[in-house]
């Protein structure tokens, strides 16, 4: 009877394999868009305005004579050209030095005459040198199309957009939001990311590649508690 209750090695191996593979399937989930960067759709069709003969028609928005149509209303699309590039460096160098000394001439007569001059000298010195250097650089290029979420009275527009790309076994997320002035948009309805005010740009990834680039939970735990 005891022989049948004792688990075999193959059964234990199968159980361990199932437990190891199960978390991988549990972590797999469908990528959902971020509602904070959701597209804004155009409002209901605006009522038709009868031209009054003036050259400038407010209902047409910002449309220069020598260029094509540009985004100017809620729901309009605008393409952002990402040209982000940053580089920073910092270095520090500190050197200190300190020394001191003292000497006492002992008596040569009387009960303390057995001291020698070398027995009553003291000196100290301290030196310190520290050097530190740090540097960081980042760059991001490409294009993403966003929609106008809000138009302010002065014509400035709040834009936001998100792009999700599924490549093999991973997802790439590009999100952007910020303020754009109408005159910063060129004739092809493009605007540079460097011309976006209060810009929020993020580029993240999920999936097997992103998971492999992160430290494991056990290694992260020991790194947190390590005093070195």
Curated annotation (Swiss-Prot):
A single GO molecular-function term is:
cytoskeletal motor activity
Q: Which GO terms describe its biological process?
A: bacterial-type flagellum-dependent cell motility
What cellular component terms from Gene Ontology apply here? bacterial-type flagellum basal body, distal rod, L ring; cell outer membrane
Q: Tell me its family.
A: Belongs to the FlgH family.
Signal peptide coordinates: 1-26
Has UniProt tagged this entry with the keyword Cytoplasm?
Answer: no
Instruction: Report the function annotation for this chain.
Output: Assembles around the rod to form the L-ring and probably protects the motor/basal body from shearing forces during rotation.
First-listed, main subcellular location of the protein, grouped into a coarse class = membrane
Q: Describe, as the record does, how this protein assembles with itself and its partners.
A: The basal body constitutes a major portion of the flagellar organelle and consists of four rings (L,P,S, and M) mounted on a central rod.
Q: Where in the cell is it found?
A: Cell outer membrane; Bacterial flagellum basal body
Protein name from the UniProt record: Flagellar L-ring protein
Q: Which domain of life is it from?
A: Bacteria
Q: Which UniProt keywords apply?
A: Bacterial flagellum, Cell outer membrane, Membrane, Signal
Taxonomic source organism: Zymomonas mobilis subsp. mobilis (strain ATCC 31821 / ZM4 / CP4)
